[in-house]
Amino acid sequence: LQGRGLRVRNMPSDYQKILYPLCILPALLLKTTAAQITAIGWLNAAYMASAVFPAYALARAMGMNRRRTAFLVGVTVVLPTMSAASTFMSETVFLPLSLWQVYFFLRAMLAEPKARVGWCAAAGAFCYLLYLNKEVALYYLIAWVLVRAWVWWHDKASWRAELTCNAALLGSFLVCFLLAKATLFRGLGNSYNQTGWLTAEQWRFLPFALVCDALFAVLAFWAFPVLLPLCGLHRPRRGSDARRTQLPLFLLLSLGIGVAVIAWSITVREDLGSPSPRQHTRYLEPLLIPLLAVTLDTLDEKLTKTRRRILAVLTIAWGVLFVAVCRAIGAGAGDNTLLQWFDFVADRTDRLPVLGQGAWLAVWRAVIAVGVAVLGVLLVRRRGRRVLAGAALVLCVLCYAGEWRINRWTYEVPAGTAQQASALNDALAELDGRVLFIPYGVRQRDSQLIETYVARDVYIVEYETLLQSGALADGVLDLTAEAVGPEYPGRAYTDLDTADWVLAADGVPVDTSALEKADAACPAGYVLYRNLDAQRVRFAVS
């Protein structure tokens, strides 16, 4: 909006997932950053709460009765990802928009061929909107094309209608994509650099990542909202109900593609070699609501002996693989969402006596596998369904509480500190020249406070990053000779040749001989200096 393009940490960026930042722009009309952040919290709550509307629309479109509709809406209300409303995470709008995306595709499935073209065009344009929020949302687009190919395979006479629908879907998406590339994002590359080829070591780790992520995804979705629709798939014969033939496959494909994308773009790159890779179920969580609806429809049917056997085989296979392949979940509990209950117990197994942590983790996984088998028996025999529905709601509440606890521990800022940081922002806005912020800690709470409450452009370079780069070998950061930048996004600034002001965190050993302490009030743990030698910053290091 300032005419400087997209920027992250005051450097040009190709990151184009701008939908969530646009959604919180109204809060910037307020004067202080403290007031703006409070307003963003209320906006987040409103966006998250709006997820009940597409959940209700989905339930009604699937012909659910009032009791089941209330159950699906109730699960939506207490989904763990709802806790993201207290953060700056884009899940705030990803959840409601994902549910609307599924709704549009469902209406396209149920529509007559001519009307389906319009629904597909709308779904394609909406998918681009969702793509502006998260690139992983493309799993909806890919899954839809695969489902239409499956429908065509079973009804060759419908090839023209299927071709027209896919053309409308992909065409509307591409029009939005190319229009944005030619205007708003002109000259920019890709948002992520995680699309490159893997190394040999990463290729070897990829099969484990795929299997492990898939097994945990099934567990996160309570197993049977995945396994029951899988064993209850029907061929899409002419005149068949798309809610029972096409929708289950569409959701399962979306889930599978999402898991594969996570394994390829995150697990093999950030958890390489780890026996307990982190789980990013927050990218998949919106699929739980429509999968629950499909599961309820599947349970209405009488499972044949063959399908019961398939379900038993799938349950046993999942249980054996889960016990044998998986171990635990790595650090990063805020991404686990629906797996908070698993992680809560797993994190405390090191406190148990007699057996080691590895053995107790194996016991915990075995208990879960047995519990899933018992759950399957109860579902197939149609026993205790109301109790199980209540248990699902309780489990969601517990996972929500776990997410809230983690977010509060990670992001909470005392009101007094927030006011001080907001006052610092006002003071910095009056200063002329460049401001260099040197936090102590790479991507830690030091930088979070300043980056959140200071709206002015500042240059960020962590003290640890300076040490590792060798820029402080002589104790002097010479900005005319050395190009430095923050740990993320991992590039050096091209326009940082002077630092008129230095904002240093406690622990950063700046040499104050050429610095003059400013009058601006700073939050505890920070000091603002006027740099008398703007081209150099000296440090008291040997």
Question: Where are the regions that the model predicts?
Answer:
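Hydrophobic, aromatic-rich transmembrane alpha-helices
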Residues: 215-252, 291-297, 368-381
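Transmembrane-helix motifs of polytopic, lipid-linked glycan transferases
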Residues: 42-63, 96, 100-104
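Membrane-proximal lumenal/periplasmic loop motifs of glycosylation machinery
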Residues: 3-25, 38
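Short periplasmic/luminal acceptor-recognition loop of GT-C membrane glycosyltransferases, typified by
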Residues: 409-418, 426-471, 501-507
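Short acidic/glycine- and proline-prone juxtamembrane loop motifs at membrane-interface regions
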Residues: 13, 83-94, 133-136
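Membrane-embedded helix bundles of polyisoprenyl
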Residues: 68-81, 92-99, 119-127
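Membrane-interface transmembrane helices that cradle and orient dolichyl/undecaprenyl
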Residues: 61-63, 101-120, 130, 154-157
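Membrane-lumen/periplasm interface segments of specific transmembrane helices
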Residues: 129-131, 142, 147-155, 160-236, ...
